[in-house]
Amino acid sequence: MSPQISDIKKYAFHVGDSFLFDANIWMLIYGPIANMDGRTEVYSAALREIRKNNCLIFIDILILSEFINAFSRFEFNQLNPIIKPQKFKDFRNSAQFKSIAQEISINARKIIKICCRCDSMFESADLPNVLTRYEQGNSDFNDQMIVEICKSKDLMLVTHDADFKPEDINILTANKKLLKNP
């Protein structure tokens, strides 16, 4: 299939469509920035339409891990410098982090409740090719693995990541920069 990047605001969701949401989308919907970011409504509306049309949303451990780690780091970076530990790991091991970890877990559970789990394709991915593309220095390793998952399971990727390279997958986004990609 030739890659197609489509505007999520204009996409007509159909029964049988299957999606993989990138971690940045989960951050916009269930992350700490959800109420502060105008993009939240666009992707939340798409999520409602996906669910209304009985489409499937898949998630793998890479994306869930990215969501959890990004949420944690966001909270760490928001701390007042006076009380902020120097190292993230010190913060993560502090009593202060416990309530944040609980909030992250609550939101991660919301995600997994509405998703089908899939494996990360580590065993079957063409890792030498993925590493060859990675060593060229212009692509993220996890993003490449996400592409492998989408290709193997015929999933459409929902992302706001402008750095995503058009590959042999379909992408839904509200990101104007990504929509301009040929």
Description of each model-found segment:
Residues M1-H14, R133, V147-P182:
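Acidic, PIN/NYN-like endoribonuclease modules and their adjacent C-terminal/linker elements
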Residues M1-I63, A70-K87, K153:
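Short, well-structured N-terminal submotif of metal-dependent ribonuclease cores
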Residues N77-E103:
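Helix-adjacent hinge/juxtasegments
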Residues D37-A46, K98-A108:
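Well-ordered, non-membrane alpha-helical segments in soluble/globular domains
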Residues S2-P3, A101-M156:
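Active-site neighborhoods of divalent-metal-dependent phosphate/nucleic-acid chemistry enzymes
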Residues W26-M27, I63-E66, D163-K165, L178:
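Short, solvent-exposed loop/turn segments at secondary-structure junctions
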Residues S65, F122-P128, K177-P182:
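A short acidic, often aromatic-flanked loop/helix-cap motif at beta-alpha or helix-coil junctions
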Residues D22-N24, D143, D161:
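Acidic active-site catalytic centers that drive phospho-/nucleotidyl reactions
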